[in-house]
């Protein structure tokens, strides 16, 4: 699950510089990369590098959100290594600016190169989907001759530019409000949920946001009040708050007048749309096909979180695509 733009119609440690991409084919800007935290499930034969599936979560998510799905995918594909990453400023990965898709794609590139991965299948949902597309498109734009990416899977997000939802701004605001409360006010997740409730009626969204909350250590073990300790979110709210424009953007622009794009990813691409979600629609589908000419679009009867709402159907789409393409 992730919180990104509109949900549906119902509606630090930095490392060496890494060459990345721009909107043209010229010299590309450089970004400090971070070493991403990850979890993995490896085949019994010890294969850790051949034909892995690398998963990128959405905004406010983490690798933990994909734990049960990864276990199920491992049962479906026991010979394929699985990696679920924490994107920068999420989970256990370092906090760093900028929070742009260029920077996120550079982090993913570093992970793939450092691990020596080959014939990578890259899967991304929402924010992670945009980062995955940005990485795929950067390969030709950068003129990389040795391309480790073989397949791309994008879940319910388009390669387009738009303003972030007011929901996103509101979530940041109330999360900052929770952090600003005096020590002792937030002792349990229920305490924090009561503050979130007036801003978000959907309990599943509130529970998802609160997976990022770190409670005072004494809250579960003792009633002793620690005047120094407060509830804190593990995501850097300051960085995210001033990254809203960047998170609504995309590094490459589609020209609707002549349907031209500055670069393409020509490999097999699976795009999964939730029919109850407006993220992928008739306005941005032409951009998808221009950037990813070897794209197949599949729909599931779900909202934005297609993998959580229809896990069995989602897994079948992914497994069939990886085995056949």
Question: Residue ranges of each PLM-predicted region?
Answer:
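Alpha/beta-hydrolase active-site loop signature
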Residues: 60, 87-91, 159, 303-306
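The conserved beta1-alpha1 loop
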Residues: 54-58, 125, 273
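Active-site loop/oxyanion-hole signature of alpha/beta-hydrolase fold enzymes
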Residues: 39-47, 67, 74-123, 127, ...
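Conserved serine/cysteine hydrolase catalytic core
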Residues: 46, 217-301
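Catalytic histidine-centered segment of alpha/beta-hydrolase-like enzymes
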Residues: 299-316
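Alpha/beta-hydrolase fold catalytic core
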Residues: 1-54, 71-81, 117-118, 320-325
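Flexible "cap/lid" loop of the alpha/beta hydrolase fold
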Residues: 133-138, 144-192
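Serine-hydrolase catalytic-loop signature spanning alpha/beta hydrolases and amidase-signature enzymes
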Residues: 58-68
